[in-house]
């Protein structure tokens, strides 16, 4: 009887998660790609004007775009077709280190805000295949939630240079955490670190959401959460961000 009950519960959870996914994808999943490929890139190449993007770097392979959600949130996106974390292109050595480029683009937040924003308030995230609304790779550059900031500060000395479970997880979901230096982040993509260092991750990259946060000692913490429908975790790493930026108040 108990086994039947657990099975029915699992079915209900999976159906509910699928329903959320359907609702989330009911809009135009190619909207960001169309903005990049049909507006920003042509405008930059033909008129040296990045609009509606804030910046377009054709040779470097990326754009920076002001997201409509939140006063300071920006997105960094490739200038060519990469759907998301599941793309094999992200594991190619020739592919730009999009997370590092996104970190360099954090200054757009300060310019928009009118004051310098401390690195400790900034976070970068990318959602899993199920946890995203758009089928064009986009890294969210935005503020970190104050409670997540506090937890990561408290866990500073417990975060290893290897991928290990973060004690207590974040936002009710399990996360892996790994500490890296600024030099490591600049030289090696977090996508590649996850694929090469976490068992079986390479074959299931689309199930993962990733985040990058600066720590008080100058290091960075990489965070990865894997899709788990039984716990209603769609691996939307964006959950650690606060697009209203209460941390600045």
UniProtKB/Swiss-Prot annotation:
Under the GO molecular function aspect, what terms does this record hold? CDP-diacylglycerol diphosphatase activity
The record ties this protein, via SUPFAM superfamilies, to: HIT-like
Keyword Transmembrane present in the record's keywords: the answer is yes
Organism per entry: Salmonella arizonae (strain ATCC BAA-731 / CDC346-86 / RSK2980)
* TM stretches of this protein: 5-25
Per its record, the protein catalyses:
a CDP-1,2-diacyl-sn-glycerol + H2O = a 1,2-diacyl-sn-glycero-3-phosphate + CMP + 2 H(+)
Belongs to which family? Belongs to the Cdh family.
One cellular component term (GO) for this entry is: plasma membrane
Q: What is its EC number?
A: 3.6.1.26
- Gene Ontology annotations of biological process type: CDP-diacylglycerol catabolic process; phospholipid biosynthetic process
**Keyword annotations of the record:** Cell inner membrane, Cell membrane, Hydrolase, Lipid biosynthesis, Lipid metabolism, Membrane, Phospholipid biosynthesis, Phospholipid metabolism, Transmembrane, Transmembrane helix
Q: What protein name does the entry list?
A: CDP-diacylglycerol pyrophosphatase
How does this chain sit within the bilayer?
Answer: Single-pass membrane protein
Location relative to the cell: Cell inner membrane
Read off the InterPro entries from this record.
CDP-diacylglyc_Pase, CDP-diacylglyc_Pase_proteobac, HIT-like_sf
Q: Which Gene3D superfamilies match?
A: HIT family - CDH-like
User: Pathway it acts in?
Assistant: Phospholipid metabolism; CDP-diacylglycerol degradation; phosphatidate from CDP-diacylglycerol: step 1/1
């Amino acid at each position: 009887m108990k086994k039947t009950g657990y099975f029915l519960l699992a079915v209900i959870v999976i159906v509910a998660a699928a329903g959320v996914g359907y609702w989330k994808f009911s809009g135009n999943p190619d909207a960001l790609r169309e903005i990049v490929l049909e507006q920003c890139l042509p405008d930059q190449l033909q008129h040296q004007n990045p609009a509606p993007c804030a910046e377009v770097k054709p040779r470097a392979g990326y754009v920076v775009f002001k997201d409509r959600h939140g006063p300071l949130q920006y997105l960094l996106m490739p200038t060519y077709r990469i759907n998301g974390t599941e793309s094999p292109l992200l594991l190619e050595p020739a592919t730009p280190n999009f997370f590092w480029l996104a970190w360099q683009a954090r200054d757009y937040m300060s310019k928009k805000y009118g004051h310098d924003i401390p690195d400790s308030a900034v976070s970068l995230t990318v959602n899993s295949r199920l946890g995203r609304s758009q089928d064009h790779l986009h890294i969210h550059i935005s503020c970190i939630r104050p409670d997540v900031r506090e937890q990561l500060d408290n866990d500073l000395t417990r975060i290893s240079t290897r991928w290990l479970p973060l004690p207590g997880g974040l936002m009710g979901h399990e996360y892996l955490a790994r500490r890296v230096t600024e030099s490591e982040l600049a030289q090696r993509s977090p996508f590649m670190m996850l694929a090469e260092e976490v068992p079986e991750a390479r074959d299931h990259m689309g199930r993962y959401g990733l985040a990058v946060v600066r720590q008080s000692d100058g290091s960075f913490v990489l965070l990865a959460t894997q899709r788990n429908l039984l716990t209603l975790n769609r691996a939307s790493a964006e959950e650690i961000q606060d697009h209203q930026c209460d941390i600045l108040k």
